[in-house]
Structure formats: C-alpha cells, structure tokens
C-alpha cells in the first residue's frame, strides 16, 4: 500500500519527468511547454467542438444565411489553402466552421485540428471588410497551427498536477481529487498568453497576406476593436489579451508583408465544412 509520503514522492517524480518531456518549439522558434501533445489536443478539441455544435443546433443558433455562409467559406477556405502549404500536417485536419447567431458577441476561435467558430456580432458590431475578417480568422487559425490549444491545456494540467501534489502532501484527498476538475475547467477558460497572441499576430498576418488579403487590415481591425473596447470590452479580448503596442507591432509588419504578395493575388479556395 502506498503511504502518503510515497505518493507525494511519486507525484514529484512524475511531475519532474513530465517537465523534461514537455519541451517543444513553436513555428516562430519559441520554446513551448507542452505536457499535452498536439494530437491529444486535437482529439479533445474535436469532442468539445461536436458537443458545442450539437447544443447550438438544438438551440437554433447556427446561421444558415447563404450569403454569409458563402462569404465565410470563401475567406476561410483561402486561409486554409495557405495553411496547407506552410503547415503540411494541417492537410489532415477536419477543417470546419460554425457561424453562431449571436449579435452581441464579438468573438471567433479555432481549436486544435481546425475546428472554427465565428459569431455574427463580429460582423454587426465591427462592420468588417473581407480583408479584416481574413485577419481575424488568420489570427485564430494561427493559434491552432502554433499548438496554442495544447499550451493552454498543458498549463491547466500543470495546475492540476500541482493541486493534486498539494493535496497528497497535506493528506487532503478532497483537494487532490478536485484537482482534475479544476484542470479541465482551466483548459476551457484560460486565455492565450500575450506571447501566444503576438505569435498569432505574426503568423496570422502572413497567412492572410499570402491568401490575397491586405495586411493593412490587421491595423484597421485592431483600431475597430479598440474603439469597441472603449464602449464595452468585446469577448474576444477576454481570451485574447492584447500584447503591448499591438498596433505598432502590426504596423511594422505591413511593408514586409506587402512584399510577399504585392498584387494581393488570391489563393485557391480549399473546401471546408460549414456546420449547419
């Protein structure tokens, strides 16, 4: 039988082993802490996405407007085409997007594995151009391509293991047991780090530019976000904290991005699933 001291020692050894195995590198060369593998993040994200979409469908919250569906499919399809070129493993992803009927919510996201969602509030509150919408979705897709979902899940797991270790050390089984629930909750609610946001800005503006959209729109998009934030902070900013000097950093990227695709030649459109 394990004693509590032995359990604590085992937990510490296990945590140390996990830490050593958790080293990874992002597409920009940044070191990443990944206790959760990218493939595990894809599997968990798919399950969460299907559950979310099912609930939305039951509540009649999935948009079926042909014009909006075509617009979203066209723009995201071009971004996915570029993603396939720059990140070949993403060719195996089940790319799909749900358009959620919620005029008050200004948000969008992309889970590991290419499972996306966009809220109608983005269009109604921000009056987005195609170029600006491409920047938002390029940013979101970049979070998935750069394994930011796995990073958030890893942070949640580290918190969970820490809580369980404290519970074991203090002979408090209830603390150890509830650690798992805390970890699962954090995986869903933790915002991206500001470092991850800067990385998604960098990768996202490149994706959108290569797809044929104006890189200047990255700047005008965040100006609109800033104006809206003065009235009421959009949900987008609660999970996407703004890095310091975001607009200035994006401004510096515009000229080199224009050199990549000076004629804004449109990328081919990869067919993706619009969830209905």
What residue ranges belong to the model's regions?
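A Zn2+-metalloprotease active-site environment signal
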Residues: 2, 7-11, 23-276
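C-terminal motif of bacterial Sec signal peptides marking the signal peptidase cleavage site
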Residues: 18-22
